Amino acid sequence: IALCDHPEIEEILTRLVEMGYSISPASLRLDDITPTILRLLRQSGEKTITIAPETGSDRLRRVVNKTLTNDEILDAADMIFESGMENLKLYFMIGIPTETDDDLVAIRDLTLQLRERMMKYARTRGHIGRIIGSVNPLVPKPGTAYQWLAMEDDRSIERKIVRIRSLMAGIDNVYFNIKSERHSFYQALLSLGDRRVAPVIEAGHRNGGKWR
């Protein structure tokens, strides 16, 4: 359940702000963001909003059943930065079925457009924030459309990781954290494994959290 799903979320946030609480949501669904919610979060001291475009292209977003468009994402970014927010965190996925190099380039292009929105408002404040991206290989999860999908092979994911790092290199005020294919394999093991995985988890714990 997303934060903004609560029918009285604006009233709840208003009361929390009045009580002096700092409010820092993990992430916000773009289609639920309102100027009032952003204003209240900013009043509570929050400077960063996290959103999940998932992909850089509208086409690939539809593959994962997301109907949000890049234009809508950019409009939401205008609202976010206009509210006084300084930083924007982004969640992206790679390894989605039908993904091509054009889709990887689209991550860079969308990030650059979001950076332009940030810079427009930063100039009026005299302070430049940051765009912080997180890229994760697709991990099939139970109960989703891709729960039976095999993960993309390690070499293919590694090539895409190298490509993303190359595309994002040298962009001022933009920082990307890209999870390794090994880390994603561990996620898949924990998400999809049954009781037979228990001895592996126990062994990893005995080994100080190291899975090798």
Task: Specify the residue positions occupied by each region the protein language model found.
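Conserved SAM/AdoMet-binding glycine-rich loop
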Residues: I1-K89, I94-R130
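Auxiliary Fe-S-binding modules of radical SAM enzymes
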Residues: V105-R212
